[in-house]
Amino acid sequence: MVEIRRDSWGVPHVFADTLRGVYRGYGFAVAEDRLFQMDMSRRSFTGRVADVLGADYLAFDRMVRSNYTPASIAAQIVALGQEDRDIFEGYAEGYNQRLAQVLANPAELMPREYLDFGFQPTVITPEDVAMVWVGSLANRFSDTASEITNLMLLGECIEAHGAEKGRAVFDALRWRNDPATPTTVPREDHDGPSPQHWPRTNPVPLSKAAAKEWMELERLRLGAFAADLEPRASNIWLVRPERVAEGKTVLVNGPQFGWFNPSYCYGIGLHGPGFNIVGNTPFAYPIILFASNGHIAWGSTAGAGKCVDIFQEHLNPQNHRQYRHNGAWHEMQSRRETIEVRGQAPVEIEVLSTHHGLVALTDHEHHTAYAKQRSWHGKEIESLLGWIGSMFAQDHASFPAQIARKASMVNTYFADRQGNIAYALAGQYPDRAPGHDPRLPADGRGEMEWRGTKPFATNPQVVNPAQGHIANWNNKPAVDHDNTCTFVWSAADRLSEIELCLPATATVEQLWGLIEQTSSST
């Protein structure tokens, strides 16, 4: 038995006596409210947009298909136990149930967008349900790697100023660690070292043609050139009861994704055996990112770790399908993808990879290729399930164990009724070889191989800091956390705005009102 009740705001609340039933109702409600949005989301995250919108989206689909391995995601889904499969299968069943109603009565139920663009919605699979999360949170937001862009910058600095001065200018623009930078983990709670300089490496420069190709790939990935994007991210503050007039624990989370219609997020209540979860989440994910279950509350902001490294592969000048590793030539792996294109014949593409990972760019002029090694590759579904598992935690003791399962990067926050607050930078991060400068592509010939991943205990994190609050605006996590591909932090940081606004003691209403003072135009 599945029942959907809507509150006074129209937000659906799903009631069922099984987990599968809850997710079946969730999928049905999403298809009822956001059919076109969800259809285009899963097409965008799986590279199937040109199939319905035509050749203008072929380059986008090519970029998406080349940036993940569908067989890996499918294998992870197949390997799940039935309880975990119930989440994805139930969601797809409910979505497809509503879709069948729409297709049976299109005159009254078909969303207008399908009529405008001239195509029909199709059924989704459990894999599609997972890919909406994987394609955005993993393949996009956890896939930041600026080494190629930095290599371009280094080349321009050297070209303009000569080798030594050019390197000095580059180091000044891409510094390692400013110890004066505001942090989310208070200094008294995390007294780590703050090294100032990276080791020097000398990767092969990037050719002009390869640089131009990379800039276009980045434009496709981001939707615009990076310099043209408005700043977006998220902020949050958590305050312990001793600093709240009403004696309550407060968590205020301000996601700053930008303005969209329909909204980037979807509000939902999930009520099943032993749980009552209410909140909202981007793209109607299976995980409710910003929510409470009556015992605990949790939230997120964009994390800034470094879980993806770019390796510079040295190619055989006579055969660019071969790369050098440990003194021998190795054949790249190859797979072919067929992209359906509305109004024309299908297009076949080739996707190459080395033992490091997918090849993101090939510089034929300089006989190099650039492969992505991701700490979270093959762990996407486990990461999602860890996040889902955290929704059912009822105390601080059980929450971190679920967060530790997440290999993809994100800032995660926790608060409970007992007055506990906590923060952790989730994700699994590489244990790099000595001499590795993560600002630039690592030498792929064997000297710079990862030694594994670091344990979760080494991630920046804090529980109940002495100051009585936790705040973040996508700032530096801890004093010994180096600058990353996403952010280059300094003493001037917008976190200071939150810290200045937080009074020594405040009412719940005052803490909620701070959102008006710290919201961006997006």
What are these regions (language model features)?
Residues 79-101, 236-242, 247, 256-258, ...:
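Structured, non-membrane catalytic/scaffold regions adjacent to prosthetic-group chemistry
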Residues 368, 408-504:
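Hydrophobic alpha-helical segments
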Residues 2-250, 255-261, 274, 281, ...:
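Substrate-recognition/specificity elements adjacent to catalytic centers across diverse enzyme folds
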Residues 15, 23-24, 133, 247-248, ...:
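Short helix/loop capping segments that flank catalytic or ligand/cofactor-binding pockets
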Residues 276-345, 388-392, 499-502:
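Compact, glycine/acidic-enriched structural inserts
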Residues 22-25, 71-88, 373, 384-390, ...:
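Second-shell loop/turn segments in exported
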Residues 139-145, 151-168, 209, 380, ...:
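Ordered core of a single globular domain
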Residues 123-134, 138, 265-270, 304-307, ...:
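Short secondary-structure boundary/capping segments
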